[in-house]
Amino acid sequence: MFTPQRNRWPETDRKGKAIAFSDEIITPPPQRVLLREDDDWQKFKEVGLLDEASLERKDRDALIEKILKLEKELFDYQHNMGLLLIEKKQWTSTNNELQQAYDEAMEMLKREKTSNAITLNEADKREENLRKALIDEKQFVAELENDLKYWQREHSVVKSTSEAKLEEANALVIGMKEKALEVDRERAIAEEKFSVMNRKSSELERKLKEVETREKVHQREHLSLVTEREAHEAVFYKQREDLQEWEKKLTLEEDRLSEVKRSINHREERVMENERTIEKKEKILENLQQKISVAKSELTEKEESIKIKLNDISLKEKDFEAMKAKVDIKEKELHEFEENLIEREQMEIGKLLDDQKAVLDSRRREFEMELEQMRRSLDEELEGKKAEIEQLQVEISHKEEKLAKREAALEKKEEGVKKKEKDLDARLKTVKEKEKALKAEEKKLHMENERLLEDKECLRKLKDEIEEIGTETTKQESRIREEHESLRITKEERVEFLRLQSELKQQIDKVKQEEELLLKEREELKQDKERFEKEWEALDKKRANITREQNEVAEENEKLRNLQISEKHRLKREEMTSRDNLKRELDGVKMQKESFEADMEDLEMQKRNLDMEFQRQEEAGERDFNERARTYEKRSQEELDNINYTKKLAQREMEEMQYEKLALEREREQISVRKKLLKEQEAEMHKDITELDVLRSSLKEKRKEFICERERFLVFLEKLKSCSSCGEITENFVLSDLRLPDVEDGDKRFGKQKLKAEEALNISPSAENSKRTSLLGKIASKLLSISPIGKTDKVTDLGITVKLPESSQPDDSLDRVSGEDHEPSATEQSFTDSRIQEGPEGSLQSEMKSDKPRRGRGRGRGRGKSVRGRSQATKAVSRDSKPSDGETPRKRQREQTSRITESEQAAGDSDEGVDSITTGGRRKKRQIAVPVSQTPGQTRYQLRRHRNVGTEEDKAQASKGATEKQERVNDDIRKVPSPKETRTPPEGENRENGKAEVLVETVTHEEIVTVETETVFKVNNTGKNPVEDPQLEVGGSGEIREHGEEDDENISMIEEENEGEEEEETERQGNDASIGKKIWVFFTT
């Protein structure tokens, strides 16, 4: 309980959270009576409860530190709020952009669906007309169907396995640290394997050089086949009319297919962009979750710190209460001590007075008895004086009793005041509103204290009066003594009187000394009381300060609790908002995924429809399909076994994940390199467009010259009619076939083609980075390249021959797809002139394709191919070998007829081919299987994603080759020759002046690449006479190329040795046997 608050306690100094006390106030040392309380006073000094300045200073420092900490926390919260608002704005903007992109994608999908429905209806109408063309295409389509199904199955399996792997990877992340050393070792092993792969690439280059030597051997053999080709060219003229009709239909189909390809490419690009944005969002969501977890951890730490502070405050409060209890106990002890002192004073004063009275009475009686006889008069006076003295003593005793009563009343009042103080303390703790009443009571107590002080002053005055009475008694005694001296007394009486006087003096001195001692003790007690009252007032002040601090601490605690509650609510709101945003974004992502899956399902439905159409025409190729299905089933079973085995081995899967990460990094580097190449290719495409403009202007002039050449050719035909051997062939010509199309029609078609090229430049090349785009591009390009109708659209009749760089010729000879079986002669010049605009574009596409470094693309990553690749290769050879063995004699006849007239009409071809290259340049191989309506970024500039990026030296060689090619094209401008000079030279001249370039057909256990040969003769730089191999039927080279790319990931050294042995066998048989026999030998091996 507290004492009354007379004055507030002084504030104590604080150091941090604890309370430190100083001992600056020097209390006066207690007297003899308070020696036992010395320890208590020393404890007060040590604790520092009496130091006001230090307590105030420490409280201020502690409060300032708290305020600074709270301000810092507020600034941090404000900063975090600002960051969260900025992030929210960014997310809203990104969400709007994604919504816009999604709406655009849905609109495009609707448009594409309608266009696809229209194209399907038209395709149903033209189904009867296209059955003949689809006989050669259905084999490739069947393989593509199997590929698509296989990829779909692989996609589903990969999805399931990827999900399982992700779950297992999340479980195995904990053990990643332990496996870091093993990963480093495996890196070293991978580097060793990389060195081995480099060594193998050097071996492949050596083998490519050997292939070049084989090409030379096949060129020599090709000269022997020229005569056979002339016989086949006659059959070609009969098919010309059918091809013209097919061409008109296929041009429309090609345009529509090109539009479908572009739409598919756009769609796939958007899908890839959506996937990338989804990945970025997932990363951002992970970062946000990490930030939220960090903020939660910080909040938990702050809560713990606040709890610690509250615990410290509670401990301090307990210590303060204990100190209060000690102070109350000491106050009670002091009150008891004061009461004991007062009682002792009263007892001693009473005893002294009684003793003095008794002594004085006895002595006075004796003195009176002795003096009665001598001095009766004096006795009477003395008795009167004694009576007066007794009255005075009675009055003094009455006054002392009154003083004792007053002191008892004051003590009672003090006890009542203490009780009131206790009540007030209880009321202060319970009710704050009663502070005013307590202040009023405190004023009353102050008044009562003042009254007590006034009573004490009255007691002092009474004591002064007692002293005055004592002085008067001494004076009266002196008077009595004088009167006694005045009396005549005998000597004995004088002696006795003197003795009595001395005794009285001694007794009076003793009484005075005792009174002085009592006065001194009273003064000391008064001083002690004053000191105690001062200390009590100081304690009251400190108590008031402590109560004020407690109130402030309670307010601060309430504020902190309110802040905590508000911050918790705010964090909960932010968490709710962030969760809502995350849910919305996840819903958006799910919607995008669902839309993407719906798009894929639509594409799959379209593919299934196409599959149903193509399955009607699969009766002829069931055997090949069954064999390949068996091989695919075996391979799928093996892969399923491998997958089950890999599931059991979690460590290997983690290693594969790491290797995949490295591969992704390499792919990123490849993508950066490809972007640079695409920029260069865009610049080249702009240059090509300008060149096409120049070519268009030059072709107008050349058509006029070609009309003159046509007239010369007609004169030449009239001369040949007289010949017995050539008359029948020349009679089949129709003059209407040699009509040239109008120049305006050519200009219009050239303008359309130019617009297509410009649109191709604006399409972003990111779609070529995905495997899906490459597959779709392969499907479209091969459908056009394999069909016999599309073969008439090639621009090889222009005679553009540009020699490839030496570094890329072997690769092109192995990788390039042979897309045509014949070389159109000059008699079908009217047919080729209608499409003469498409020639430069195709030539430039073949140039860019030949300039790409492809070393290690089909064979660099490993000669070991899977069973699936082998079966496809062998089937392609079987298809190629059938027409060479005589199953398609009609084609052979056509090639012979075309070969007869080709040498006769070479002048027109050479003239037109030379003029078509306005920029000049060296001649190159004939364009092979390059459709005019190509999708941008597919095969024209070789924008397809490479499996392995070439070194910097290969890139430098490729760029150098491109620049050299451009310089050669700018320097070569040829003259118009006469028809006579274009005849086929003899065999010796062909070997000396001409150049025979042969694409070698190589057959291994893994793949078969059939290549079309072509001989280009130069006669005094005035013309060329291309001669084509009639026995090479091209139907599956594109398939083998693609399957080679798909299956070149499995490396086996055993199959590499088998391939080397088979190449040696081809070299042995190359000089003796024909191409058909070689194919049969390779097929049997």
From Swiss-Prot:
Any one Gene Ontology BP term: nucleus organization
Stretches for region Disordered: 801-997, 1020-1077
Entry membrane topology: Peripheral membrane protein
Location in or out of the cell: Nucleus membrane; Nucleus, Nucleoplasm; Cytoplasm; Nucleus lamina
Keyword check for Metal-binding: no
Keyword terms of this UniProt record: Coiled coil, Cytoplasm, Isopeptide bond, Membrane, Nucleus, Phosphoprotein, Ubl conjugation
Residue spans of biased composition, Basic and acidic residues class: 813-825, 877-897, 949-995
Bias (Acidic residues): 1045-1066
Reported tissue expression: Expressed at low levels in roots, leaves, flowers and flower stalks.
Residue ranges with Polar residues bias: 932-941
Modified residues (Phosphoserine): S764, S787, S825, S843, S910
Residue numbers covered by motif Nuclear localization signal: 404-411
Disruption phenotype: Altered nuclear morphology. Plants lacking both CRWN1 and CRWN3 exhibit markedly smaller rosettes. Plants lacking CRWN1, CRWN3 and CRWN4 are extremely stunted and set few seed.
Biased composition (Basic residues): 854-868
Family matches, as InterPro entries: CRWN (IPR040418)
GO cellular component: cytoplasm; nuclear lamina; nuclear membrane; nucleolus; nucleoplasm; plasmodesma
Function statement: Component of SUN-protein-containing multivariate complexes also called LINC complexes which link the nucleoskeleton and cytoskeleton by providing versatile outer nuclear membrane attachment sites for cytoskeletal filaments. Required for nucleus structure organization (e.g. size and shape).
Subunit structure: Core component of the LINC complex which is composed of inner nuclear membrane SUN domain-containing proteins coupled to outer nuclear membrane WIP proteins, the nucleoskeletal CRWN/LINC proteins, and, possibly, KAKU4.
Name of the protein this chain belongs to: Protein CROWDED NUCLEI 3
